[in-house]
Amino acid sequence: MTDTPAERPDPGVAGDADWAAQARPLLVHVDMRLCKRFDQGEPIERLVALRARAVDQLMRNAWMRCIPADSGLSLHAVGGYGRGELFPRSDVDVLVLGDTAAQQQHEQALARLFALLWDVGLPISHAVRSPAQCTAAAADQTVLTALIESRALVADAQARAALATAIAPPQVWPPRDFFQAKREELLARHQRFGDTADNLEPDIKDGPGGLRDLQTLGWMALRAFGVKDLEALVGLGHVGFDEAAALRREREELARLRFGLHIVANRPEERLRFDYQKTLAERLGFADDPESLGVEKMMQRFYRSAALIRRISDRLLQRFEEQFDGEATPEPLGGGFSLRRGYLAADTESWPDGDVLQVFALFAQWAAHREVRGLHSLTARALAEVLRDLPAYEVADATARERFMALLRGPRAVETLNRMARLGVLGQWIPAFASVSGRMQFDLFHVYTVDQHTLMVLRNIALFAAGRADEHFSIAHEVWPRLRKPELLLLAGLFHDIAKGRGGDHSELGAVDARAFCLAHRLSEGDTELVTWLVEQHLRMSVTAQKQDISDPEVIHRFATLVGTRERLDYLYLLTCADIAGTSPKLWNAWKDRLLADLYFAARRALREGLEHPPPREERLREARESARTLMQAQGHDDVTIDRQFAGMPDENFLRFRPEQLAWQAASLIEVEIGQTLVKARRAVPDNDALEVFVYSPDRDGLFAAIVATLDRKGYGIHRARVLDAPHDAIFDVFEVLPQETYADGDPQRLAATLRQVLAGDLQKVRPARRAVPRQLRHFRFAPRVEFSESAGGRRTRISLVAPDRPGLLADVAHVLRMQHLRVHDARIATFGERAEDQFQITDEHDRPLSESARQALRDALCACLDPV
């Protein structure tokens, strides 16, 4: 393929069908050759230009076949095609310009033209307008945006001039109005994506820091200054040479991703979906290594490109604004700082190269003045220029380290860290943070990059400090005031994931980094040990709460022994809450809040009472009964009634549930006689979606499986299930559930009524629902793993199941257990993105632990049911 593509169908071919039959393979041939050159690493700017020129020839050839030379019509490329850029599967946007008489006269010829182009395989998007109609349509700035980049394909000088005049500023959209409209459009577009590019499946084109941001800057420059590209603004003083070069470099990075994505997807796909990420990474040459997957490297490069584009575009938008509005009189703040139109400006000419003290002073001023809108563009640019010369903390002097700690202890510390991270200063001061900036993990559990997750954790800590966490974190506001030094929690949050991607245990490696940082910044040995311990153990509370039975005193004793002190417990609890809630917007819920609070209070009590002599079982039973009795008495129940209900409840019940749960269960049992079935449901936490379902029933084959299948059909996700043997051959089933699907209405009364109806029927007819696996989950399949161990002193068998998550998973597992004639005594459900990690305590139908042969039969049945292959 030459730089001026010569491939074109024979213009002498008589029939349109024959002409299209010649043109189609030629277009395919062009794309194949461009793909080959793409794989060879040719610049994307050249490839998209070559494809546009190849399509130009087809367009002109088709025009000459269909439209008379004296038609009075002209053909113009608009939009991206007008810029001379065509990605492999992009639309081909064209404008036919001519007066209304010419449009009507040649209506059939135009229809023939567009049909012919579609037949060739070109995704044509067309408009037919007169100059006056162009002026009217351009009242919509999106239409104007497409027209200002028009390029004549078949048009004389008069037609080109007519189009230019129709959309000139005196007619529509003066430059200042256009700038404001495009800026508002950009901000609104960013909001649609959560104002971050750090999504699991980012949009290369329209997402924050994407190609559309660069195009927006170009449109503004074209309308305001009449220049075709941002490089031309360097000479006008609006853009620095380094900024223009950086934007050009990052544009090439994103354009290469987009070009490859179109090839891999074979459609105009703009989102880096999981469907394509791995294939695209392989095509671009990103290889796996022991520390990172190739796809993670590719995504990190994307996130870093998007972040840099956002930083520079923010500066340019501010400069464009100043160009229209003019500079305001500076408002001195002292120390070489001032406010200019609400932006913080520094006398950067007096900054020595690499003077980190001046940089830290800048952030201190920013934190001290809430009215600051942001950094002045010239100051932000100066900061970017000195960034590479700033020392890391390891080689900085003691004064600089003291200034950093002052920022950490000062007002709005989390905002300051966020700003430092966004502007690259934090990564320069702590190189390990720069290493994880933009780093993603190829799974569905971590929905943010490591640096973005870290900042989300710090943001949650700031909520604790501001007292605004009560709604989502039930006891954080009680724990926060007890912290001796809040900055230690910030440091633990900053370092807890800083070693991800190095290989090895990131908690241990991060603890080494945290200790070195604390010692370098002259923290006391006690403070250093606390931060180091928090980083090393930051997962411990979450794992204990979600994967172990925290109603078991041995579990609490082990956890409390590990923690050792009330101070460590307070810090670890807050770090754990902030960490889980900062991992994914959907991960934190009322159930996890209560679970962690229960573990916190149980550990706090164990520490208070002493770890050497934990209370015996009989004492714990007595305390639980008395606490529940007090609650029931307050509700008006007499002791005779209370004793009768307590007698119908298994002892283990009093060790597994909180007093208010016991009181609710006992009060509910007043309504039922022996041999009857009772179903009750309530909100586990007032004003929250979490529900607690209590089922009292004669023991029946398939009871647990039927309840689980019904909850699944109604759209509820089960987080915990407990099955206890009660007197008179009855069963206590207690489920903690949350609405998981949109059709789960969250009404406890309706849910209880549905379960009553199901349990009144034939349980053997209740089957799990069949639902499709969501698209994202399909790309994270792995073979299930089933492990067995003893529990409850050897009286039960514990199953640990790790499998790809999917709708109805627990219902299918329950069905398998039923078909194997096994009894479920406890179920703990945990989902981590695409991974379901569930634990069950079971026995055979005679209440005995499973034999080796029964274990193997169950393993085979579960793997056959859950294996994604």
From Swiss-Prot:
EC number: 2.7.7.59, 3.1.4.-
Region (Uridylyltransferase): 1-332
Family recorded in the similarity comment: Belongs to the GlnD family.
SMART domains noted in UniProt: HDc (SM00471)
UniProt cross-references to NCBIfam families, sorted A to Z: PRK04374.1 (NF003347), UTase_glnD (TIGR01693)
Keyword terms of this UniProt record: Hydrolase, Magnesium, Multifunctional enzyme, Nucleotidyltransferase, Repeat, Transferase
Protein name: Bifunctional uridylyltransferase/uridylyl-removing enzyme
Keyword DNA-binding: no
Ways its activity is controlled: Uridylyltransferase (UTase) activity is inhibited by glutamine, while glutamine activates uridylyl-removing (UR) activity.
Known cofactor(s): Mg(2+)
